[in-house]
Amino acid sequence: MRTKHVVVLPYDEKWKQDFEDIKNELVEVLGDFAIAIEHVGSTSVEGLAAKPIIDIDVVVKASDVKRAIEALESIGYIHEGNLGIEGREAFAYEGKEHLQTHHLYVCPENSAELKRHLAFRDYLRSHHDAKEKYGNSKLEAAKLYPEDIDKYIEYKSPVIEEIYAAMKMKFN
């Protein structure tokens, strides 16, 4: 069991600005080789309860992944590899106390993981019932398992699988 305090909050309009603040810092270092900087994950879906952590996918050409890693390392991000998920490179960070807590990934533009993130986000944005069901499962999971991230994830997984089935996507 990984012990990690789980906090899920009602949607906060501030998360949009938190994303923009982080994005602005990323744009400065990545310049024009970042094809897009996408706000993904639950904080990107208006009205959805979420852990207050901004998920960000930096989209680059496959040939620019190494360049993006080096640029991000130059401003304090720590490359962690793909953490077992093909199609993305994950980053931790130090010295970013001025920014909202966030998870940062670099994804090649044709990555299946990027497509999955965007499709899930867009589906929840356009399907109120799915958004409500998912949000409720997250709130309930956090209430039941406030100190166990693995149980939290396990509890909400059937709802995620149901959403992927409705989207006709395979859930890993």
Annotate each language-model stretch with its function.
Residues M1-E38, E161, N172:
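Helical scaffold of the NTase/Pol beta-like nucleotidyltransferase catalytic core
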Residues V6-E13, D57, F120-L124:
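Short histidine-centered catalytic/ligand-binding loop motif
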Residues L26-R67:
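Active-site nucleotide-donor binding segment shared across nucleotidyl transfer reactions
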Residues A34, G76-Y77:
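Short glycine-aromatic motifs
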Residues E46-L48, E70, Y93-E97:
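Short, conserved, surface-exposed binding loops centered on an aromatic residue
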Residues A68-G76:
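Short amphipathic alpha-helices in soluble, non-transmembrane regions
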Residues Y77-A112:
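Conserved catalytic core of two-metal-ion nucleotidyltransferases
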Residues L114-N172:
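Catalytic cores of NTP-dependent nucleotidyl/adenyl transfer enzymes across multiple folds
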